[in-house]
C-alpha cells in the first residue's frame, strides 16, 4: 500500500546531549514508474521543535500534516498531548479513517508513528521508527548500526536510508535529513 518511499526517525542521547533526526529518500513512484527523484517528504514543525515525515499518498499525507500541525499548535508544541488528541479527532471523522498515508513525528523526548487509520504507535524503544516500502530495511539497518557501530546520529540515519535505497525498488538514495 505505501510504495514509493522510506522515512526514518531516530532520537536519543549522545555525550549527554539529546538529539532527534528524520530522513527520507526523494523518490516518488506512480505505479511502476519513477516520476520524481528529489521530492521532500520531511519537514520541521512548531518552531523547529518537532520533526515529521510521511509515506503514502501525497494528498492524504498533506491532509495528515495539516491536521497534525493544527493540533500541535493548539497544544503549544506538546507532542505527547498532540498525538493523543490527533487520534481522538481522527476517530470522529469517517473520511479521515481511509487515508492512505503514514507519518513519523518526533522531538527530543518522543517518537511516534501516526497511521492513516488513526493509530498512534510509540516506537518500541522510543528511539527508532521507520515507515514506507523500505521502512523495514531502514529500521533493521538503524537498529544494527545503533547497537554495533559508533556512528554520529546523522550518519546512522544516512547509512540506514542508503541500505534501504539499495534494497527497495521504491526508494532511492537521494536522501534529505533534518535535525533538532
Swiss-Prot record:
Please give the InterPro entries that the UniProt record associates with this protein: ATP-dep_Prtase_HsIV_su, Ntn_hydrolases_N, Proteasome_sua/b, Proteasome_suB-type
Member of which family? Belongs to the peptidase T1B family. HslV subfamily.
Q: Where in the cell is it found?
A: Cytoplasm
Q: Where does Na(+) bind?
A: 165, 168, 171
Naturally occurring in which organism (per UniProt): Helicobacter pylori (strain P12)
Instruction: Name a GO molecular-function annotation.
Output: threonine-type endopeptidase activity
Its assembly, as annotated, is: A double ring-shaped homohexamer of HslV is capped on each side by a ring-shaped HslU homohexamer. The assembly of the HslU/HslV complex is dependent on binding of ATP.
- Could you confirm whether the keyword Cytoplasm appears in this record? yes
Q: Which domain of life is it from?
A: Bacteria
Keywords in alphabetical order, please. Answer: Allosteric enzyme, Cytoplasm, Hydrolase, Metal-binding, Protease, Sodium, Stress response, Threonine protease
Protein name in UniProt: ATP-dependent protease subunit HslV
| Activity regulation (UniProt) | Allosterically activated by HslU binding.
Kinase keyword on record: no
Give EC number(s), comma-separated: 3.4.25.2
Q: Where does it mainly reside?
A: cytoplasm
Mind telling me which GO cellular component terms the entry cites?
A: HslUV protease complex; proteasome core complex
Question: What are the positions of the active site?
Answer: 5
Which NCBIfam families does the entry link to?
Answer: ATP_dep_HslV, PRK05456.1
Give the record's GO biological process terms: proteolysis involved in protein catabolic process
User: What role does it play?
Assistant: Protease subunit of a proteasome-like degradation complex believed to be a general protein degrading machinery.
According to UniProt, the reaction catalysed is: ATP-dependent cleavage of peptide bonds with broad specificity
User: Which PROSITE patterns did the record assign?
Assistant: PROTEASOME_BETA_2 (PS51476)
Amino acid at each position: 500500500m505505501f510504495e514509493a518511499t522510506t522515512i526514518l526517525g531516530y532520537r536519543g542521547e549522545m555525550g549527554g546531549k539529546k538529539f532527534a533526526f528524520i530522513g527520507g529518500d526523494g523518490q516518488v513512484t506512480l505505479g511502476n514508474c519513477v516520476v520524481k527523484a528529489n521530492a521532500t517528504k520531511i519537514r520541521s514543525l512548531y518552531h523547529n521543535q518537532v520533526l515529521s515525515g510521511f509515506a503514502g499518498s501525497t494528498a492524504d499525507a498533506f491532509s495528515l500534516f495539516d491536521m497534525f500541525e493544527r493540533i500541535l499548535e493548539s497544544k503549544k508544541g506538546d507532542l505527547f498531548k498532540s498525538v493523543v488528541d490527533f487520534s481522538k479527532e481522527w476517530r470522529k471523522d469517517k473520511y479521515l479513517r481511509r487515508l492512505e498515508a503514514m507519518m513519523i513525528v518526533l522531538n527530543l523526548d518522543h517518537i511516534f508513528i501516526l497511521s492513516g487509520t488513526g493509530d498512534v504507535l510509540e516506537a518500541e524503544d522510543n528511539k527508532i521508527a521507520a515507515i514506507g516500502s523500505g521502512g523495514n530495511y531502514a529500521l533493521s539497518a538503524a537498529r544494527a548500526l545503533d547497537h554495533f557501530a559508533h556512528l554520529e546520529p546523522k550518519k546512522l540515519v544516512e547509512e540506514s536510508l542508503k541500505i534501504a535505497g539499495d534494497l527497495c525498488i521504491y526508494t532511492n538514495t537521494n536522501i534529505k535529513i533534518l535535525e533538532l
